[in-house]
């Protein structure tokens, strides 16, 4: 799945749960956790230069249950630093401040789990149980990146950015999740017919 979808899905779930105890910082923590493990692209050079260290590639070490948690913790810590969130706030003209605490890390890990589930549904597979196993798991329901899903997720992010009433934002989030599940259902149906 794409970067935008990995942010929108946990953010949407946490928003649509409509729990009073979840504020915008909590929902942002989930969304940031959803994208945190894709910053493994920074490790790409290691896996490219030293093929024996292939686990240091995109969809490598950070796409496991254990290292996903570690990555989420580091990511939430970094973006909770005033210099980092100050720069981001300045660039996008929105307050995206999150706090580094166990609640934020737990919600970020929820984002990681949604990310792992979405990537499990795509082609290529992910090493969920690394370092205990190098086996890559996949359901091959979605393509690695689906252009329609990417475009719709980006449109939802634009809607979230605009100063619209919360009910319209919730409608966009719900519609996106319905679309994502529907596409998955259609593809599962196609796979079953092919068997």
Each language-model region and where it sits:
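N-terminal membrane-targeting hydrophobic helices
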Residues: 1-195
């Amino acid at each position: 799945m794409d970067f935008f979808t990995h942010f929108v899905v946990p953010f949407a779930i946490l928003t649509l749960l409509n729990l009073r105890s979840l504020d915008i910082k909590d929902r942002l923590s989930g969304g940031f956790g959803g994208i945190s493990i894709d910053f493994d692209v920074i490790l790409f050079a290691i896996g490219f230069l030293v093929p024996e260290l292939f686990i240091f590639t995109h969809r490598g070490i950070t796409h496991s249950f254990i290292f996903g948690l570690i990555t989420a913790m580091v990511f939430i810590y970094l973006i909770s630093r005033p210099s980092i969130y100050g720069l981001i706030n300045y660039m996008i003209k929105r307050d995206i401040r999150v706090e580094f605490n166990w609640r934020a890390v737990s919600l970020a890990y929820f984002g990681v789990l949604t990310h792992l589930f979405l990537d499990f549904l795509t082609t290529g597979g992910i090493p969920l149980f690394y370092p205990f196993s190098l086996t890559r798991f996949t359901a091959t329901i979605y393509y690695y990146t689906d252009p329609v899903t990417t475009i719709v997720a980006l449109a939802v992010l634009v809607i979230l950015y605009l100063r619209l009433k919360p009910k319209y934002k919730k409608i966009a989030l719900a519609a996106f999740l319905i679309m994502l599940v529907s596409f998955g259902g259609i593809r599962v149906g196609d796979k079953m017919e092919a068997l």
